[in-house]
C-alpha cells in the first residue's frame, strides 16, 4: 500500500472521555496524530479501543495502531487468526510476527497453517524494500 489508511486506538476507556479517564489522549496521542496528519500521513483517531477494530472489519482502514501488544491481538486473532500479522514499532528495523506467535507446541507435527507466517514475511520484505528506497 503506498498510502495506507490507518486508525489509532486510544489508551484509555472511551478515548479518555475528555480527560475523565486519563490524559494520555489529550497530552500525547492527539498531538501525535495531528503531527502525522500535517506530514500527510493518512491517519485518524484516537478511537476507543473497543470499537476501532470495527473500522478494519468494515474495510474502512488498512491498519490499526495500538498502544500495547495485547490491545491489538484480541481483535486481530478474532478477525483472522490464520492470516493476522503484528508489526512492531519504535525500533530501528522492521519486525513482523504471525498473530499466533511461534506455535512451538505444534512445530514438526505437520498441522501448522503457514498463512500468517508467509504474510508476516511478505510484509517484512515490503517494509525493507520501502525502507531501502527511502534511504
Language model regions located:
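Glycine-rich phosphate/diphosphate-binding loop of Rossmann-like nucleotide-binding domains
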Residues: 1-46
Amino acid at each position: 500500500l503506498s498510502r495506507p489508511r490507518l486508525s489509532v486506538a486510544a489508551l484509555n476507556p472511551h478515548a479518555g472521555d475528555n480527560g475523565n479517564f486519563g490524559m494520555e489522549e489529550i497530552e500525547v496521542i492527539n498531538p501525535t496524530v495531528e503531527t502525522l496528519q500535517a506530514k500527510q500521513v493518512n491517519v485518524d483517531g484516537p478511537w476507543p479501543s473497543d470499537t476501532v477494530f470495527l473500522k478494519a472489519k468494515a474495510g474502512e482502514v488498512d491498519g490499526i495502531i495500538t498502544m500495547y501488544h495485547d490491545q491489538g491481538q484480541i481483535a486481530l486473532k478474532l478477525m483472522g487468526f490464520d492470516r493476522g500479522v503484528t508489526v512492531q514499532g519504535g525500533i530501528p528495523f522492521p519486525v513482523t510476527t504471525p498473530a499466533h506467535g511461534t506455535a512451538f507446541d505444534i512445530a514438526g507435527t505437520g498441522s501448522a497453517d503457514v498463512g500468517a507466517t508467509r504474510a508476516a514475511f511478505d510484509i517484512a520484505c515490503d517494509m525493507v524494500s520501502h525502507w531501502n528506497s527511502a534511504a
